[in-house]
Amino acid sequence: QRQMCIRDSVNREPWMQNARFIDNFKIRASYGMLGNNNVALYRYQTIIDNSGNEIVNGNPDLTWEKVKILDAGVDLSLFGQKLEVTFDWFRKVTDDMIVNVPSTPSSGLLAAPMNVGKAEVKGYEIGVGFNHSFTKDIDFSINLGYSYNKSKWLEITNDELINGNTIYRKGHAIKEYYGYQADHLLTQDDLDFRVPIIGGYDGATTAQLPGDIRYVDTNGDKVITTDDRVPLGDQDPHSVYYGNLSFRWKNLDFDMQVNGVGYVPIFYQGLISNPLDPEYGGTPQRWHLDHWKAENPDRNAKLPRVTTDPGNNALLSTFWKENGAFVRIKYMQLGYNFKALAKKIHA
């Protein structure tokens, strides 16, 4: 572990002495390098069950992830420390990132952890706080914070790795969803005109029927295969924010905290995408009424045809993609201090 830090209290400089409303003005920068311990334990070991079967494929050649962090920031306090502002810009580069790399299907081996490349995360954080006692009976405090970060691979083995519905690709986010682009629902006309579908049109039956999700043939080979999958978005939100509010009036006090995240893709699964699955109760809900029906074949229905085996309709695709941004009240508390009343009772 190595670290270097530089800071300067600007408000102590002679040319700042007349700015009396500034209580503290600090500029700082730091750079450090360390090994990353935020990874699963014993990844170098192969684990077997009681029957002698491998359930975790280890890698004895694993090395430490090496993290280099550059941070620059400003701390500002004003008006008798009533208003405080902090700002940080950071860049974190991780060498020898550990990723579970899938083996070829023919090998029959489990995915094994490997050091596959170099990744970068950079962004900024800002916090603003205000607190003031207006009178002996009234106190008020509020703190707001926002952070933004974005990741990308700088280097990775073979420029990309695919593990299930996750893709690791050079120049893209560290972990991205990997699936199909959806283009409404299939109609009988689509099949009559032989639009690209999963499995093609060999044989008397097809793998997809009217009411199934129509997927985009991104590589233009006239059939839908796993090669048509594309990145569908970063698995981690770029924006995170929070707020704390505190207020007191005499013996009455109020506290509240909110937090949330900006845009992040989420995908409907389980009961929503497969209402007849017994694992989730097997009972359709009210929102399933707007599904594709043979008597009303709407290509823009909210849900595909309902079936006990959704098959290809359950694939990860933009059809099930939604915006996962949210704001929530983490807690809210209203209190009353009976200290004065307790003194009277005690007296």
Please identify what each model-predicted range represents.
Residues 2-6:
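Short, small-residue-biased leader/transition segments that mark boundaries at the very start
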Residues 10, 31-33, 66-70, 89-95, ...:
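Transmembrane beta-barrel architecture of outer-membrane proteins
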Residues 20-65, 91-115, 154-157, 163-165:
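Surface-exposed extracellular loop regions of Gram-negative outer-membrane beta-barrel proteins
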Residues 27-33, 44, 85-91, 142-148, ...:
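Transmembrane beta-barrel strands of outer-membrane/channel proteins
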Residues 114, 131-235:
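Conserved small-residue
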Residues 261-347:
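Extracytoplasmic gating/loop element in the C-terminal half of outer-membrane beta-barrel translocons
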